[in-house]
């Protein structure tokens, strides 16, 4: 709605500390929102009920990126328990200071520490009726418009991590001497470095192909994006593991960056 854009967009643009978080994932069923279910039993546990001109939200969200510090939340909730998740869920704009909203905890994560991870609880959280963003059946199409580019960006981040690990390793094996010669001159090491390069190039090519398909509106773009997420994360993990092994004991030291 225009009035919500006028109120919140300037703060989101002008204040770097004014963060927005998407509250989707739940303790039971994780991100079922993105799976091709449409049975009532697969709908969200977080409920939103319209009572006397106000939406009343009850439920819990967890693993929410920026959830601990966010000042504004886009919350996804079940608004029609008679149908499945694709047709019976809606999104709402919920300010952090709304009565009934509690940021319960900040989760410590092994990776992705560039943003925090929070758990959000809604206990009779009351919203004005006009804080509804997208209702029921229109939600799936609308959310895909921002989530698909986000998935491609995540794959690009993975690629960047892999490239950094490869570059550090390539420099290390040229400098470190064992058996009277640099590690790179040992064929077993060179072969592993080549394998790392092949994996990264496959991710890079698939990433470009998928981004082009999304821009062109190719029907299979959504499927390609899902495949890209898997391919990028798995191949980059293998690259980073090999990078650590080629560093030897130094690969476990924090000062090296590989760990």
Q: For the regions a protein language model found, what residue spans apply to each?
A:
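Cytochrome P450 C-terminal beta-domain/meander region
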Residues: 34-58, 255-257
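Flexible, small-/acidic-enriched active-site or ligand-binding loops
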Residues: 99-126
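Conserved hydrophobic/aromatic beta-strand scaffold that supports enzyme active sites
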Residues: 21, 45-47, 54, 72-76, ...
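A short core secondary-structure module
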Residues: 58-103
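Glycine-rich phosphate/pyrophosphate-binding beta-alpha loops
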Residues: 62-67, 112, 149-154
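FAD-binding glycine-rich core of flavoenzymes that anchor FAD
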Residues: 1-32, 52-55
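Long, acidic (Asp/Glu-rich), low-complexity accessory segments flanking structured domains
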Residues: 123-141
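Alpha-helical interface subdomain recognition
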Residues: 50-55, 121, 148-259
